[in-house]
Structures are given as C-alpha cells and as structure tokens.
Amino acid sequence: MGLFDRGVQMLLTTVGAFAAFSLMTIAVGTDYWLYSRGVCKTKSVSENETSKKNEEVMTHSGLWRTCCLEGNFKGLCKQIDHFPEDADYEADTAEYFLRAVRASSIFPILSVILLFMGGLCIAASEFYKTRHNIILSAGIFFVSAGLSNIIGIIVYISANAGDPSKSDSKKNSYSYGWSFYFGALSFIIAEMVGVLAVHMFIDRHKQLRATARATDYLQASAITRIPSYRYRYQRRSRSSSRSTEPSHSRDASPVGIKGFNTLPSTEISMYTLSRDPLKAATTPTATYNSDRDNSFLQVHNCIQKENKDSLHSNTANRRTTPV
C-alpha cells in the first residue's frame, strides 16, 4: 500500500482529526498555557481589622484562571481579571480590544467547534461514500479551525506581552506551558488534515470523471457494433456519395449510351414495312436479298466497339430473323 492509497489517506485523516480535536480540547480546558511570577492575594479577617497579604510566587495560568505553584497559597486558583481597576490603559485603545478578545476566548472555542464538525463530516463520509461533498466539507472545517486556532494564539501572545499590570522585568520572566504547545500542535494537525481531505476529494472527482469517460466510450463502441446501426450508416454514406456525384450515375445507365439510339434506325432501314402487299412486291427495298447479306453484315459490324458487347444478344436475334 502506497502513501497515496485511499485507505491510508482515510486512516490518516481520521487519526489526525481525532488528535487535533483532543489536543485543542485539552488546551482550552487546562491552565498550563503560561508560567510566570505573580502575586497571590488573600484576605484574612481578624477581630478588628482586615489584613491583606500579597505574596509574589510562581504561577501557571490558562484561558480562564491562574493558579499558584508555591508559597502559602500553593494550589490556590482564581479567575483571571482581564480588566483590573489599577490598570493604566484607556477604554478606547487597542489594548482594551485585545483584553476583551482574550477574556472571551472566542477563537479557541470556535476552533474546538469547527474541529468537532470536521470530525463528524469525516465519520459521515464513511457511511455515505457516494456523497463526495462531505469530505470536502470536512476539509473546509479543518482549515477554518486551524485559522481560528492560530488567531487565538496570536491574540493570547499579544495580550500577555502587553499586560500593563506587569513590570518590564516580570514581562520578560515567563514561559509557555504544555497547554500552549498542545494548541499550536493542534493547529498544525488541523491544517494537515484539511489539506489531506481536500486532496482526497480531488482524487475522487478525477476518478469519477475518468470512469464517466470510459463508460461513454464503451457505450459508443457498443452502438457501432450493432448490425442495424452499421447498415444505416452504410446507407447514409452511399446516399451521400450518390448525391455528390450525379453525373456519373447518369452516364452509367444504358439509356445514356450514344450508340444505343442509333441502332433502331439502322435495323428499321434494313426491313421496310409496308401495309400494301403490291407495293411491297414491286419495291426493291422491301425484299430481303441473301446475296448481299455478307456485305451488309460487314457494314453493320462497324458499330462502335464500346457498345457491341452490351447489345450483342439483341442485334443477333434481329439480324437472323426476317420480317
């Protein structure tokens, strides 16, 4: 089995779709996108005062919350406040827009939904193999999911790098976690699966066109082998050839022969027919003279050579039969 075999392509597409969906779902649902140093705040109520204790520790964060990795608040998680009160940004700047998009996490969630739809299309293509547009829809879903994923990653990086609540030293002391790399890997796999699905659709379309052409050729060859079709075709070809050459058909008929019209006048002059027997007896041309038969036949044989063969039987009977 080669790499471009249909079974191998379908297996790779199915495995890739499951992997991309699983990786993106894990990335969205976990809190290990970013490792950085932050402040874990807590409030403790005593008898007469409320004290706030701020402690800067190592934290890990995701799309939804931040958790402490060390200190007295190890394992404590809190929701991410994307719009703190002490932040020095204006509401009409691009920073506010990035924070709004970052807070909604719309692009990662949209990527998960599109990956799920693409997986359903791939599963449906196995049950409805005659509907080739399903695999094309799967490819479109996966490509769109990859684009939505990479947009969400770019927005996350931009929002984290431009966080005004962090000092310059804190902005440089962070690293991305395995959830972030799961999302990036999901983007790569989703794009590969989308391209492979579109390639499968193109291959199937080419096979269908080749099969249709072969079927049309076989039907045409089968029709030409039918005897009635061949007979009609021969008649049409003959009629067309006759219509293009009318002069040859007229010349070939015996009526058009030049010597054929001269023969009756010659024979009638040999035997003069008369209704009066007396005139027939006195007229020298009405009697048949056997002495001059040989000389007359010699003159009569001077008929054109090209007409002698076709009229031989008729002239022989008329020469030997007296009237």
From Swiss-Prot:
Residue(s) carrying Phosphoserine: S253
Tissue: Brain.
InterPro entries the UniProt entry points to: CACNG_subunit, PMP22/EMP/MP20/Claudin, VDCC_g2su, VDCC_gsu
One example of a Gene Ontology biological process annotation: response to calcium ion
Region (Disordered): 233-261
Modified residues (Phosphothreonine): T321
Gene Ontology cellular component annotations, sorted alphabetically: AMPA glutamate receptor complex; cell surface; cerebellar mossy fiber; endocytic vesicle membrane; glutamatergic synapse; hippocampal mossy fiber to CA3 synapse; plasma membrane; postsynaptic density membrane
Keywords, in A-Z order: Calcium, Calcium channel, Calcium transport, Disease variant, Glycoprotein, Intellectual disability, Ion channel, Ion transport, Membrane, Phosphoprotein, Synapse, Synaptosome, Transmembrane, Transmembrane helix, Transport, Voltage-gated channel
Positions annotated with a glycan in the UniProt record: N48
Post-translational modification: Phosphorylation of Thr-321 impairs interaction with DLG1 and DLG4.
Gene Ontology molecular function terms on file: channel regulator activity; ionotropic glutamate receptor binding; voltage-gated calcium channel activity
Post-translational modification Phosphotyrosine, affected residues: Y271
Residues annotated as transmembrane: 10-30, 104-124, 134-154, 182-202
Entry-linked Gene3D superfamilies: 1.20.140.150
Disease per record: Intellectual developmental disorder, autosomal dominant 10: A disorder characterized by significantly below average general intellectual functioning associated with impairments in adaptive behavior and manifested during the developmental period.
Family: Belongs to the PMP-22/EMP/MP20 family. CACNG subfamily.
Subunit structure: The L-type calcium channel is composed of five subunits: alpha-1, alpha-2/delta, beta and gamma. Interacts with the PDZ domains of DLG4/PSD-95 and DLG1/SAP97. May interact with GOPC. Acts as an auxiliary subunit for AMPA-selective glutamate receptors (AMPARs). Found in a complex with GRIA1, GRIA2, GRIA3, GRIA4, CNIH2, CNIH3, CACNG3, CACNG4, CACNG5, CACNG7 and CACNG8. Interacts with GRIA1 and GRIA2. Interacts with MPP2.
The name this protein goes by in its record: Voltage-dependent calcium channel gamma-2 subunit
